Protein backbone atom coordinates (compact mmCIF):
# COMPACT_ATOMS: atom_id res chain seq x y z
CA UNK A 1 0.00 0.00 0.00
CA UNK A 2 1.35 3.36 -0.95
CA UNK A 3 0.95 6.27 1.41
CA UNK A 4 -0.91 9.49 0.69
CA UNK A 5 2.38 11.39 0.85
CA UNK A 6 3.86 9.18 -1.84
CA UNK A 7 0.82 9.89 -3.99
CA UNK A 8 1.19 13.60 -3.40
CA UNK A 9 4.86 13.40 -4.35
CA UNK A 10 4.00 11.55 -7.56
CA UNK A 11 1.37 14.16 -8.39
CA UNK A 12 3.70 17.07 -7.79
CA UNK A 13 5.49 16.98 -11.14
CA UNK A 14 6.71 20.53 -10.67
CA UNK A 15 8.20 19.53 -7.33
CA UNK A 16 10.92 17.41 -8.95
CA UNK A 17 14.35 17.97 -7.54
CA UNK A 18 16.20 20.79 -9.19
CA UNK A 19 19.20 19.24 -10.83
CA UNK A 20 18.11 15.67 -10.11
CA UNK A 21 19.78 13.22 -12.45
CA UNK A 22 17.27 10.97 -14.23
CA UNK A 23 20.06 8.38 -14.62
CA UNK A 24 20.49 8.14 -10.86
CA UNK A 25 20.12 4.54 -9.62
CA UNK A 26 16.85 3.67 -7.90
CA UNK A 27 16.92 4.09 -4.14
CA UNK A 28 19.44 6.92 -4.05
CA UNK A 29 18.96 10.39 -2.66
CA UNK A 30 20.70 13.59 -3.83
CA UNK A 31 23.83 14.52 -1.89
CA UNK A 32 22.22 17.44 -0.06
CA UNK A 33 18.75 18.51 0.99
CA UNK A 34 17.11 20.99 -1.37
CA UNK A 35 15.35 22.92 1.40
CA UNK A 36 15.46 23.39 5.14
CA UNK A 37 13.36 25.44 7.55
CA UNK A 38 12.28 25.52 11.18
CA UNK A 39 8.75 24.40 12.05
CA UNK A 40 7.58 26.25 15.15
CA UNK A 41 5.75 24.16 17.74
CA UNK A 42 2.93 25.09 17.79
CA UNK A 43 2.86 26.36 14.22
CA UNK A 44 2.64 25.66 10.51
CA UNK A 45 5.10 25.60 7.64
CA UNK A 46 4.10 25.88 3.98
CA UNK A 47 6.23 23.69 1.74
CA UNK A 48 7.33 24.60 -1.80
CA UNK A 49 4.91 22.07 -3.31
CA UNK A 50 1.90 23.70 -1.61
CA UNK A 51 1.52 21.18 1.17
CA UNK A 52 1.51 22.37 4.76
CA UNK A 53 3.12 20.85 7.85
CA UNK A 54 1.54 21.70 11.19
CA UNK A 55 2.53 20.98 14.76
CA UNK A 56 0.71 21.32 18.05
CA UNK A 57 1.01 20.03 21.60
CA UNK A 58 -1.83 18.14 23.28
CA UNK A 59 -1.92 17.36 27.01
CA UNK A 60 -2.35 13.79 28.23
CA UNK A 61 -4.77 13.30 31.10
CA UNK A 62 -3.77 10.99 33.93
CA UNK A 63 -4.90 7.42 33.27
CA UNK A 64 -5.44 8.01 29.54
CA UNK A 65 -4.35 5.12 27.27
CA UNK A 66 -2.06 7.23 25.11
CA UNK A 67 -0.51 4.27 23.26
CA UNK A 68 -3.85 2.95 21.99
CA UNK A 69 -4.99 6.45 21.11
CA UNK A 70 -1.80 7.24 19.16
CA UNK A 71 -2.04 3.93 17.28
CA UNK A 72 -5.70 4.48 16.36
CA UNK A 73 -4.96 8.09 15.33
CA UNK A 74 -2.20 7.00 12.98
CA UNK A 75 -4.36 4.33 11.36
CA UNK A 76 -7.30 6.72 10.93
CA UNK A 77 -5.21 9.40 9.25
CA UNK A 78 -3.25 6.96 7.03
CA UNK A 79 0.11 8.49 7.89
CA UNK A 80 -0.89 12.10 7.18
CA UNK A 81 -0.99 12.80 10.91
CA UNK A 82 1.03 11.30 13.71
CA UNK A 83 1.10 11.60 17.50
CA UNK A 84 4.54 11.51 19.10
CA UNK A 85 6.03 12.01 22.56
CA UNK A 86 6.75 15.77 22.70
CA UNK A 87 9.59 15.39 25.21
CA UNK A 88 11.27 12.66 23.14
CA UNK A 89 11.15 15.08 20.17
CA UNK A 90 12.92 17.75 22.23
CA UNK A 91 9.87 20.02 22.38
CA UNK A 92 9.12 21.79 25.66
CA UNK A 93 5.42 21.29 26.45
CA UNK A 94 5.14 24.71 28.11
CA UNK A 95 7.30 26.92 25.90
CA UNK A 96 7.03 24.96 22.65
CA UNK A 97 10.07 25.00 20.46
CA UNK A 98 10.90 24.09 16.92
CA UNK A 99 11.74 21.15 14.71
CA UNK A 100 13.84 21.15 11.56
CA UNK A 101 12.22 20.21 8.24
CA UNK A 102 14.37 19.44 5.21
CA UNK A 103 14.67 17.04 2.33
CA UNK A 104 16.57 13.79 2.85
CA UNK A 105 20.35 13.93 2.89
CA UNK A 106 22.72 11.24 1.62
CA UNK A 107 23.23 8.60 4.28
CA UNK A 108 20.18 9.59 6.35
CA UNK A 109 18.90 6.78 8.54
CA UNK A 110 16.15 6.40 11.08
CA UNK A 111 14.68 3.74 13.33
CA UNK A 112 11.22 3.26 11.76
CA UNK A 113 8.38 2.60 14.18
CA UNK A 114 7.71 -1.11 14.38
CA UNK A 115 11.25 -2.20 13.52
CA UNK A 116 12.21 -2.43 17.22
CA UNK A 117 15.21 -0.10 17.06
CA UNK A 118 16.72 -1.38 13.80
CA UNK A 119 18.03 1.38 11.54
CA UNK A 120 16.97 1.84 7.94
CA UNK A 121 18.14 4.21 5.22
CA UNK A 122 15.62 6.91 4.40
CA UNK A 123 16.23 6.26 0.69
CA UNK A 124 15.14 2.63 1.19
CA UNK A 125 12.07 3.70 3.15
CA UNK A 126 11.05 6.13 0.40
CA UNK A 127 11.56 3.47 -2.26
CA UNK A 128 9.41 0.97 -0.36
CA UNK A 129 6.69 3.63 -0.03
CA UNK A 130 6.64 4.05 -3.81
CA UNK A 131 8.03 7.60 -3.89
CA UNK A 132 9.59 8.18 -7.34
CA UNK A 133 13.33 8.88 -7.29
CA UNK A 134 12.81 12.30 -8.89
CA UNK A 135 10.43 13.37 -6.08
CA UNK A 136 12.43 12.13 -3.10
CA UNK A 137 14.49 15.27 -2.58
CA UNK A 138 11.25 17.16 -1.86
CA UNK A 139 9.92 14.71 0.73
CA UNK A 140 9.76 16.49 4.10
CA UNK A 141 11.96 14.93 6.76
CA UNK A 142 11.20 16.24 10.27
CA UNK A 143 14.15 16.24 12.71
CA UNK A 144 14.69 17.27 16.31
CA UNK A 145 17.03 20.03 15.07
CA UNK A 146 19.33 20.77 12.11
CA UNK A 147 21.73 17.95 12.97
CA UNK A 148 19.27 15.96 15.08
CA UNK A 149 17.75 12.57 14.47
CA UNK A 150 14.74 12.04 12.24
CA UNK A 151 11.39 11.96 14.07
CA UNK A 152 9.07 11.59 11.05
CA UNK A 153 9.33 11.04 7.32
CA UNK A 154 6.21 13.11 6.71
CA UNK A 155 3.30 11.06 5.53
CA UNK A 156 5.31 7.84 5.61
CA UNK A 157 6.64 6.74 9.01
CA UNK A 158 7.63 8.05 12.46
CA UNK A 159 10.76 7.03 14.34
CA UNK A 160 10.65 4.39 17.09
CA UNK A 161 12.57 6.67 19.52
CA UNK A 162 9.75 9.24 19.65
CA UNK A 163 6.73 6.94 19.85
CA UNK A 164 4.15 7.44 22.57
CA UNK A 165 4.46 5.30 25.67
CA UNK A 166 2.40 5.08 28.85
CA UNK A 167 4.93 7.56 30.30
CA UNK A 168 4.15 10.20 27.64
CA UNK A 169 2.96 13.39 29.35
CA UNK A 170 2.44 15.61 26.28
CA UNK A 171 1.61 14.62 22.72
CA UNK A 172 3.17 16.28 19.71
CA UNK A 173 0.73 16.11 16.80
CA UNK A 174 2.32 16.54 13.37
CA UNK A 175 0.17 16.81 10.23
CA UNK A 176 0.86 17.12 6.53
CA UNK A 177 -1.93 18.26 4.26
CA UNK A 178 -2.53 19.88 0.89
CA UNK A 179 -3.26 23.59 0.75
CA UNK A 180 -6.14 23.85 3.21
CA UNK A 181 -6.38 22.81 6.82
CA UNK A 182 -8.10 19.47 7.28
CA UNK A 183 -11.31 19.42 9.27
CA UNK A 184 -10.98 18.81 12.98
CA UNK A 185 -11.96 15.35 14.12
CA UNK A 186 -13.59 14.87 17.48
CA UNK A 187 -11.59 13.03 20.11
Where are these regions (language model features)?
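AMP-forming adenylation/ATP pyrophosphatase catalytic core
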Residues: 1-187
Amino acid sequence: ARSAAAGAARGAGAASAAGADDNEPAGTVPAAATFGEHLAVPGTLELADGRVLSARILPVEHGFDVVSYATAHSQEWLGESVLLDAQACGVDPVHGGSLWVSGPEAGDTMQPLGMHGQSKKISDLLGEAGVPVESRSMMPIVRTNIRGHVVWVAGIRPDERVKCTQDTKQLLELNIYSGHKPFERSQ
